[in-house]
Amino acid sequence: MRRIIFVLLFFTFLGNGAAQEIDSASKIDWETNRFAVELEARVASTESRTAATVHRAQTRLDQEFPEALFNGLLPLPVDSRHVIEDAVREDPDLASRIARLARTAERSVPRPMQNLRGVSRTYSISLFPDLTQLFVNHRVPYRMERVVRWVPTREFTGIVIYAAEPLPLHGSETGSGPPERVQLVPALLPEIYDTGLRPVLEQDMIDPAAIERWGVAHYTDQTSPDAWRDRAGTQPLRIMARRAFGIIPTDVMISPEDADRILASDHNRNLLKNGRIVIIVSADQIDRIR
């Protein structure tokens, strides 16, 4: 994996004449489409543990949150080529725009720790539209390929792609050996291809309003239709992912036959354009602590 799944940031700073220790942990939940940062400030053992001391610690948490949010987001995949850190390097202006997300973050009620030894607080932002709007650069969806020959298909209510098991990574074959097998990694802007590398859904083919509403696809580890009926409806096209694609394996590859069943129908192409896609991934990819 390109990034370590769990990162605990620990640092000490001086404030109001006493040392306070700050712990920061971030978590992304693709089921709820939220990114959360939990900060915890511990009062130094040499400082009196009064309500005023805890209040100062809480104030420090709020001051440190923008930096913790920025650092926590850096490893998050945007697409199969970039994590947010890469995007910031290519466009430094993104750094200030990401930092501004802290202003509108949801904040939990501060939670005093036992014996007033500190305080913790959780902050969260939504992936859609708060974060994705920073990376969507088109206003009108690009036209998708249309299959004009007759294809056995029908109108579906959504598209469900099963990708919970390790998949062959496209392009990883070496000599006569089998390809590397990887878990599909959720991303803000995933793409879909068939196994011949024909584009089925690229970033600029989806309606920006759909991305703002609920993202390109809904990630879940639930196979029960009740868990994703609102997104894919009651009669979805169910597809098995064939391969994963990308430097970061975020993109799904499906069979040419399944791709044809989608691209041969105006109705089914609109399912892609409107983000009526569910991707079933392994449970450890859904709720990730960094």
Briefly describe each language-model feature range.
Residues I4-F13:
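Sec-dependent N-terminal signal peptides
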Residues A18-R290:
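Domain-level marker for long, solvent-exposed, non-transmembrane regions
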